[in-house]
């Protein structure tokens, strides 16, 4: 038995907390025996004093164990349980292709996703643009979909890492969100509760990234990889570019449309293709489903070319109570905004830089995202036909096409898009889509 204030005092004085002390505190968050003030105090001491690797692992596992940890043994699955987590960005629709692609290659992907907040889109919001789709199936239904289809993308239920929900809500109002040990534990508690064999992290870098600098993104990737591997889950991370919108579109229904077109081969944005293939390749390697990066690439290309990945996506949508013919007739089902017209730059030039965060907020202004967690979303609005860095804009080539439901919304978004995109005379130096790989070995 410990005194909560003594645990806080110990960390306040820069000492190392034991696994038992951390677990006692986290269980107190779950059981409501720890007050919001005490959570805030510990969060601030961790913010200033950091945590050792042992403390970070103990915090992550205590938060994971505060609720249900999924166990798949009884299903006798004939492949690895693998997942991916992204730190979030704009036009980051990779999950919708990646899950089916990996499942088509023999993996099982029990993906528990989140909603969008601020400039970053949420995978759950994208899926909810599909009429009837159930993102909260019960446990038996979730397990059945994984067993029969190989992938399901669902929301976090109250039984998964419940201590994290309360801890995060307090961090959010006490300026302690951006603490690497706390971010690491928050992300991994939920992911490790999925009962995974392997995890791949997509840590974004650039003007639309969660972390403001490359160095901080790198630190976060290293922290997550270190803690997850020490907690018993084989994990690697890719640092990927978010200095421009990743896909050709940003907005819920628009991104779902792009995902289906990607899977069927109708249209594939090269940047989105590079990042999706890199992440899927990591997942196949981590799960022992490919012998090398080249082998992974050819297996993934095969399931795109032969239609297996698109078929798995369609089966997942149907299994989650969406339309049975969604892949064939997505345009029949996805909501469409009443107004769709291009926004042009005020002068000709080459795109030299983008404020990707501001472009994400333009989607929020249209009603396609949330400023607060309680906001409702208009799934039909957003941007598509996005210009890319290095491309020339003129009277023929717009910056984007804006999908809005009122002229006033369109006008506001047009102003925000113009302000977010810088023009010059020469193209910027091309940056890689994947900056580096972080693994336990390196």
From Swiss-Prot:
Enzyme class: transferase
GO biological process per UniProt: pyrimidine nucleobase metabolic process; thymidine metabolic process
Pathway(s) where this gene product acts: Pyrimidine metabolism; dTMP biosynthesis via salvage pathway; dTMP from thymine: step 1/2
Keyword Translocase: no
Gene3D superfamilies: Nucleoside phosphorylase/phosphoribosyltransferase catalytic domain (3.40.1030.10), Pyrimidine nucleoside phosphorylase-like, C-terminal domain (3.90.1170.30), Transferase, Pyrimidine Nucleoside Phosphorylase, Chain C (1.20.970.10)
NCBIfam families membership: PRK05820.1, T_phosphoryl, Y_phosphoryl
Protein name: Thymidine phosphorylase
């Amino acid at each position: 038995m410990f005194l909560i204030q003594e645990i806080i005092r110990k960390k306040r004085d820069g000492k190392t907390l034991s696994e038992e002390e951390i677990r006692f505190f986290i269980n107190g968050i779950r059981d409501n025996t720890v007050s919001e003030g005490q959570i805030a105090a510990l969060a601030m001491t961790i913010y200033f004093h950091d945590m050792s690797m042992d403390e970070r692992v103990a915090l992550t596992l205590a938060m994971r164990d505060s609720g249900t940890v999924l166990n798949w043994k009884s299903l006798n699955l004939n492949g690895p349980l693998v997942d991916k987590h992204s730190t979030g960005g704009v036009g980051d629709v990779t999950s919708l292709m990646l899950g089916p692609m990996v499942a088509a290659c023999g993996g099982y992907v029990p993906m528990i996703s989140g909603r969008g907040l601020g400039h970053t889109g949420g995978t759950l919001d994208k899926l909810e643009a599909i009429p009837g789709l159930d993102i909260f199936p019960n446990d038996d239904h979730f397990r059945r979909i994984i067993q029969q289809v190989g992938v399901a993308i669902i929301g976090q239920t109250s039984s998964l890492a419940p201590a994290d929900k309360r801890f995060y809500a307090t961090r959010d109002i006490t300026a302690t969100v951006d603490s690497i040990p706390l971010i690491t534990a928050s992300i991994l508690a939920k992911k490790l509760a999925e009962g995974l064999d392997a995890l791949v992290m997509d840590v974004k870098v650039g003007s639309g990234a969660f972390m403001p600098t490359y160095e901080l993104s790198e630190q976060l990737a290293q922290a997550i990889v270190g803690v997850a591997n020490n907690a018993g889950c084989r994990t690697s991370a890719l640092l990927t570019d978010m200095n421009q919108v990743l896909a050709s579109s940003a907005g819920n229904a628009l991104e779902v449309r792009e995902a289906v077109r990607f899977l069927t081969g109708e249209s594939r944005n090269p940047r989105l293709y590079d990042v999706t293939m890199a992440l899927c390749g990591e997942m196949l390697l981590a799960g022992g489903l490919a012998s090398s990066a080249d082998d992974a690439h050819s297996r993934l290309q095969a399931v795109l070319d032969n239609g297996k990945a698109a078929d798995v996506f369609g089966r997942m949508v149907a299994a989650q109570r969406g339309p049975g013919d969604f892949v064939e007739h997505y345009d029949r089902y996805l909501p469409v905004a009443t107004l769709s017209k291009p926004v042009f730059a005020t002068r000709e030039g080459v795109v030299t830089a983008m404020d990707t965060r501001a472009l994400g907020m333009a989607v929020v202004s249209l009603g396609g995202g949330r400023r607060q967690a309680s906001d409702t979303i208009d799934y039909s609005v957003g941007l598509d036909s996005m210009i890319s860095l290095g491309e020339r804009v003129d009277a023929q080539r717009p910056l984007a096409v804006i999908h809005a439901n009122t002229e006033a919304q369109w006008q506001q978004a047009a102003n925000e898009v113009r302000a977010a995109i810088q023009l010059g005379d020469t193209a910027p130096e091309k940056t890689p889509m994947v900056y580096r790989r972080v693994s336990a070995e390196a």
